[in-house]
Structure formats: structure tokens, C-alpha cells
Amino acid sequence: MIGMLRGKVWEIQADKLILDVQGVGYQLSIPYGLLGKAHPGHELILYTHVILREDELALYGFSSAAEKELFLLMLSVSGIGPKAALSILSTLGIGQTESAIASENITLLTKVPGIGKKTAQRLILELKEKFKGRAIALEGIEGAGSLPQAAFHSEAMETLLALGFSQEEAKKALQALPDSAQALSTEEQVRLALRSLAATK
């Protein structure tokens, strides 16, 4: 099974890209957020998942292990296929998806193309308990109602928690970021947050 690929972007298509790995081109479906950042010749490391069907082998790529894990969790829900799971990640990102499920926010989930009320209810019913703690960690982050900002902040929050900071420390550091940080990558947001944390030590 292919668990990870490292290579250069060869071609970008409507909803896929081709990754050149030592002369072999792998076609992967990836979230739109990642697709928008990819450029031909740019090196990417993707966490991957393979889905085998009778007439097709489909490869999906993700920017982090957490993104892949969420994709697989959604696939475990009855009625959620890879297209729907990828659409949710593309529209909401990791943080907003987890927060919407944990808070039973059907309205937000049904904003995703192809996700109706019944599908949103199934997602909530089967997955909400898994995300209760993570939703608490996201509470109080400035701009949490904004899809792009919350998505960036949630991934930065997860990174800071993984580095050993408490929820309170991470939350305060992210709240202190300027509004312009919304346009930054997760790595850049984490770097700014770490500077803020170092200054308070």
C-alpha cells in the first residue's frame, strides 16, 4: 500500500495533480486548498490513501497525517464516499469540519457541495464524540466563524499542542496574531505564534 509520496508537481488538472516521483507520474485527487498552493516543479510530500474498485484504482493525497485521518474517519460513515469526504475537506478544512461535527452544526455542513441534511446528520451522529475535545480547543479563537481563518488557526492549534504547549497557551498565542496572518500558511502562523510564546517566557 502506498502511504506517502514525495515528488515534484508535473501537471495540475481541474481537481487532481500528477506528481512525478523518480520518473513515475502518480495522479492524485487532493483537497482544493492544497491544489491552490501547488505549482509545476514544486516539491510536495503527500500522505496518501488508495481506493481499489473493480475497474479503477484511485489515489488520494493529503498535506498532513491529520487530514488523511479525518478523510478516513468520514469514509467510515455510511453514505460518505471519497468524493463527498474530499469535498468537505476542500470546503471546510480540518478545523471547521471537526468543529461543525462536534457542535452539531448542520447548517455549516450543508454548505458543502453535495452534502444534504441527512448526510450531515449521519456525520454528526457517528463522529461527534471523537471531536468533542478538539472543539473545546478551538473555542475563543478570533474569527472562528470565518471558514478560511478558522481552518488555518485550527491546524496551527493542533501543531502547537503537538509541540507540548497547553490549550490556553496555544489559544492566546493564536489570538495575538495580527489580522494579516489569515493569509499566511499554517507553518508561518506557527512560527509567529512561537515567537509570541517565547516572548512571554
From Swiss-Prot:
Pfam (any one): RuvA_N
InterPro entries (alphabetical): DNA_helicase_Holl-junc_RuvA_I (IPR013849), Hlx-hairpin-Hlx_DNA-bd_motif (IPR003583), NA-bd_OB-fold (IPR012340), RuvA (IPR000085), RuvA_2-like (IPR010994), RuvA_C (IPR011114), RuvA_C_sf (IPR036267)
Subcellular location: Cytoplasm
Annotated stretches, region: Domain I: 1-63
Chief site of localization: cytoplasm
A single GO BP: DNA repair
Top-rank lineage group of the source organism: Bacteria
GO MF terms held by the record: ATP binding; four-way junction DNA binding; four-way junction helicase activity
Region Flexible linker: start-end pairs: 143-153
CC terms in the record's Gene Ontology section: cytoplasm; Holliday junction helicase complex; Holliday junction resolvase complex
Alphabetized SMART domains for the sequence: HhH1
NCBIfam families, sorted: ruvA
Protein task: The RuvA-RuvB-RuvC complex processes Holliday junction (HJ) DNA during genetic recombination and DNA repair, while the RuvA-RuvB complex plays an important role in the rescue of blocked DNA replication forks via replication fork reversal (RFR). RuvA specifically binds to HJ cruciform DNA, conferring on it an open structure. The RuvB hexamer acts as an ATP-dependent pump, pulling dsDNA into and through the RuvAB complex. HJ branch migration allows RuvC to scan DNA until it finds its consensus sequence, where it cleaves and resolves the cruciform DNA.
Domain characteristics, as noted in the entry: Has three domains with a flexible linker between the domains II and III and assumes an 'L' shape. Domain III is highly mobile and contacts RuvB.
Complex and partners: Homotetramer. Forms an RuvA(8)-RuvB(12)-Holliday junction (HJ) complex. HJ DNA is sandwiched between 2 RuvA tetramers; dsDNA enters through RuvA and exits via RuvB. An RuvB hexamer assembles on each DNA strand where it exits the tetramer. Each RuvB hexamer is contacted by two RuvA subunits (via domain III) on 2 adjacent RuvB subunits; this complex drives branch migration. In the full resolvosome a probable DNA-RuvA(4)-RuvB(12)-RuvC(2) complex forms which resolves the HJ.
Family assignment from sequence similarity: Belongs to the RuvA family.
Protein name (database record): Holliday junction branch migration complex subunit RuvA
Originating organism: Desulfitobacterium hafniense (strain Y51)
Record gene name: ruvA
